[in-house]
Amino acid sequence: PKLIGDPRQPAPLAINATFEVLGHAFRLDGPVLYATTDPVRGERLREVLVFPPATVTPARDAAMSVNGKPAPVVLRVRAGRDGVKGSVTLPVPAGWRVDPAAVPVELAKAGDETTARFAVTPPSGAAAASLRPAIDVDGKAWSFREHVIDYPHIPVQVVLQPAQVRVVPLQ
C-alpha cells in the first residue's frame, strides 16, 4: 500500500555517498546501475537486481477443468543464477490430483529457461482454487513469477510477484 502512486518499485540496491568539496558536504543517493550497449538502441541502463535462484511464471493466469478432465498448467522456469538444479512442484488442495507430482529441472546458465507441464484434476463439485507453484533449489522453496517491462523509451524493469495460477472446474 505504501508504494501506491509510485511509478516504480524502490531500487533493491542503492548507494549513499558523501563528498566534501571546499569544506561543503554533498550527499548523493541513487540506485546501483549497470550499462549495456545494444547495437540498435544504444546504451541501456538497468538496476542491479536481487533475484531468487529461479522463477516459475505461469503461461496463463488461469486454467479450466471441463467436465472433470485435467486442466493443463504450463510454467516457464527461468534461472536467476548459474547452475540451478531443482524440482518444480504444484501443491494442490486435498482431494485434487496433480500429474506429475514434481518436474526436475537443470539450468546451466542464468537466464536459461525451460517449461514444466502439469495436469490438475479437481474432485467433483470442487470450487475454483488458487495454486502456488514453486521450485525447490538447495532445499529451499521459491515461488516467484517474473514480468519484464522492456520498452525503448524507459529503463528495463523486472517485477517479481508471488507465483499463482487459478484452476477453475466447469461442469
Located regions from the model:
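Long beta-sheet-rich domains in secretory-pathway and surface-associated proteins
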Residues: 1-170
